[in-house]
Design a protein with these regions (language model features):
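Active-/binding-site microenvironments in catalytic and ligand-binding cores
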Residues: 2-175
């Protein structure tokens, strides 16, 4: 999954001033060094709690920051030395294997979307990435993830846990 920068500007707090859509990107915009983060073992461990299947009920499977089954600030810190100008952060969560078949009538209940309960970047991870960019004086080209979104489902639910499209979606807001 890759979001265009004009998509990031759906929030007024965004640090990103680039308003281009993906069709306006040049080859230089979409190539660069890769910084690889693999969280698939942690995601698989969380899925194993429910026989390898995700549940939209966070009491059954939880891909939020508190469980570690998502991208954490420590993951970003662990690759900080590799973050250079124009780098791409590429995250493997293993979630792509859930994108199969036709889903239910309510698309939010498809296992891939899982009622906004899936791994991705939360506020702490995004904040750490921006901190490293600022400290090093670099700007990454972007984030790519094998998922519905680069933001975690927890992030999408907002700080109150009930507010989709509210104050969450931290990569979109802070990007």
């Amino acid at each position: 999954h890759l979001d265009s920068t004009d998509h990031y500007l759906n929030k007024n707090k965004s640090n990103n001033t680039d308003k281009r859509s993906v069709d306006e990107y040049t080859l230089r915009d979409i190539i660069g060094p890769i910084v690889y983060i693999n969280i698939s073992a942690r995601v698989a461990k969380e899925l194993a709690r429910n026989g390898g299947k995700p549940s939209p009920d966070t009491k059954v499977t939880n891909f939020g920051t508190s469980t570690g089954a998502t991208v954490l600030a420590s993951d970003i810190e662990n690759v900080a030395a590799n973050i250079v100008d124009r780098a791409w952060i590429v995250v493997h969560s293993g979630w792509d294997k859930l994108f199969v078949g036709k889903g239910p009538k309510n698309p939010f209940m498809h296992p891939y979307i899982n009622g906004l309960n899936y791994p991705g970047f939360g506020k702490d991870a995004v904040t750490k990435l921006i901190e490293i960019e600022n400290r090093k004086g670099v700007r990454i080209n972007g984030i790519v993830m094998d998922n519905l979104s680069i933001d975690s489902g927890e992030s999408g639910r907002g700080s109150d846990g009930k507010n989709p499209y509210g104050d969450g979606w931290y990569t979109h807001q802070l990007g």
